[in-house]
Curated annotation (Swiss-Prot):
Residues 55-84, 95-124 form the 4Fe-4S ferredoxin-type domain. InterPro entries: 4Fe4S_Fe-S-bd, 4Fe4S_Fe_S_CS, NADH_quinone_OxRdtase_chainI, NDHI. This is NAD(P)H-quinone oxidoreductase subunit I. SUPFAM superfamilies: 4Fe-4S ferredoxins. Binds 2 [4Fe-4S] clusters per subunit. It is an enzyme of class 7 (translocase). Its EC number is 7.1.1.-. Belongs to the complex I 23 kDa subunit family.
Length: 218
């Protein structure tokens, strides 16, 4: 009889501990259910990158002096600079410039050390292709202006996910109805227009008060 009671007690302890672990796991699950989603419905929703985002490199052929500084500072010597020496002017003449984005690590060293600022990092991050050889961009492809996320009317641009308000370290600390970060340009324009209208209204009201005082003095 005593052995049976000990088995029942052990079984009860194991059941209680299992229920405790189950409640802890479900608690984490329910906590995540109350949080805001951190994903976007790509490609119908796209994030607007930050201003310092290191995307596709933009190249300006007219500014390049073929100094090959970008090649020397590149960790993998990726840029290919094709140039010839002009014997009359004793200067380099650039023929072709290319970067293979299939191997690029987007470190930004070439942009940082370029003496003529002919290279710049853009916000374009959609570089997928069916053929890896098409990722080798020449000076013509590099010279194209980057496409904007907000230019496509069928895509909803989202800017609130990549950023957090000042002083917030964890995105889950924000309430569900609060914006996670920066605002869209249209929202900023509306707020500026509202502020201007309020300033005009305050100025008009301040002008009316002296007029009333003058009328009473008369």
């Amino acid at each position: 009889m005593l052995g049976f009671l000990e088995k029942v007690a052990d079984y009860t302890k194991e059941a209680v501990s299992a229920a405790k672990y189950l409640v802890d796991g479900l608690g984490v699950t329910f906590d995540h259910m109350r949080r805001r989603p951190v994903t976007v419905q790509y490609p119908y929703e796209k994030l607007i990158p930050s201003e310092r985002y290191r995307g596709r490199i933009h190249y300006e052929f007219d500014k390049c002096i073929a100094c090959e500084v970008c090649v020397r500072v590149c960790p993998i010597n990726l840029p290919v600079v094709d140039w010839v020496m002009n014997k009359e002017t004793k200067k380099k003449e650039l023929r072709n410039y290319s970067i293979d984005f299939g191997a690029c690590i987007f470190c930004g060293n070439c942009v940082e050390y370029c003496p003529t600022n002919c290279l710049s990092m853009t916000e374009e991050y959609e570089l997928s292709a069916f053929d890896r050889h098409s990722l080798n961009y020449d000076n013509v492809a590099l010279g194209r202006l980057p496409t904007s996320v907000t230019s496509d009317p069928s895509v909803r641009p989202l800017r609130e996910l990549p950023y957090l308000p000042k002083g917030i370290m964890d995105p889950h600390e924000l309430p569900a109805n609060q914006q996670r970060a920066g605002k869209l340009p249209s929202q900023i324009i509306k707020e500026l227009q509202a502020e201007k209208s309020e300033e005009k209204g305050n100025n008009n009201s301040s002008d009316i008060v002296p007029n009333k005082l003058n009328s009473t003095n008369k």
